[in-house]
Amino acid sequence: RFLSNICKATWPVLFFFFALSNPVFSQSLVINEIMTSNSNSIKDEDNSYQDWIELYNSGPTSVNLLGFGLSDDPLVLYKWTFPNVSLASGQYLIVWASDKNKTLVGGQLHTNFKISSTGETILLTNTSGVTISTVPPVNLQTDISYGKYPNGTGPYAYFGTPTPNAANLSAGFSEILNPPVFSQASGFLTSGFSLTLSSPDPGTTILYTLDGSEPDENNLSGTTYNYKNQYPKLPGQAFGPFLYNSFQTLQYTAPIPVADRSSQPNKLSAMSTTYDFTPPYFPNGPIYKGNIIRAKVIKPGALPSKVVSKNYFITPSGSNKYSLPVLSLS
């Protein structure tokens, strides 16, 4: 009778503990990283790039997610619910925000909604109705993620190198910068002009190049390299001399003059691309040239902007110079 009374007294306590155990341990679950405009990070099982949400379990115990809700609407916390899957301690789980609504246990999980790249609140809610992790609305550029740093515990930050299904090991950025604004669109123009660059973000610096290279804050002094245009093709032929060229990043401080560069010496068109000792395709004189201007915005503690490239061709005949469409790759 004594043991029976103990069992009767203990059973409700044990039942109460186990009933609460999963919600308690679920507090270690976080939305660790998200991407709302995916064009090049990871693909789903259908070989397509989709938005994704990464969960991370920082606790000591596996958590069963059955009945947990994911939503982009604070008024509908269980917009999409998890099937009977568990997330082990220290593990990550990718849920695709693709609107494909897949909940097959053992397969990849897909929500029944997508996430706007301009920003939506994302919520993870446990079976007790408690929202245990919330990502605030944030405007994300393509292939930029937003996640916790330090991993799993810190505030949210921007990442230029996303880490789906892995820890956020590199320090994130507190701000993401908008691309620079050019005062003139690319194209053919009949006369030169002064190009102005601007940034919509305060306290920033604009870097640009005129040689087609990527703007780089570590190349403000320029980089010189050497190359050769001649190599022996036949016995007795000598190696050609070393030639030199350079590329450099500039800091924008004043309008950039854009003019017809056709009278300047040939550079790229004068570089050999074959093993011919005397290439027959070198131009006999200066050729028609365009202006390639590439720029980006930087700021301490902020994720640099995407590089913007513009091409300008100055000629009296304007766009009528060629009868065929012109495609510029830079």
Which positions does each model-derived feature cover?
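Activation on beta-sandwich/Ig-like modules and their edge loops
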Residues: F25-P155
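C-terminal segment of classical bacterial N-terminal signal peptides
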Residues: F16-F25
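First exposed extracellular module after export/assembly in secreted or surface-exposed proteins
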Residues: F2, E45-D46, P200, N284
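Intrinsically disordered, low-complexity peptide-like regions
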Residues: L3-S4, L20, V30, T36, ...
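Bacterial N-terminal signal peptides that target proteins for export
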Residues: R1-W11, N22
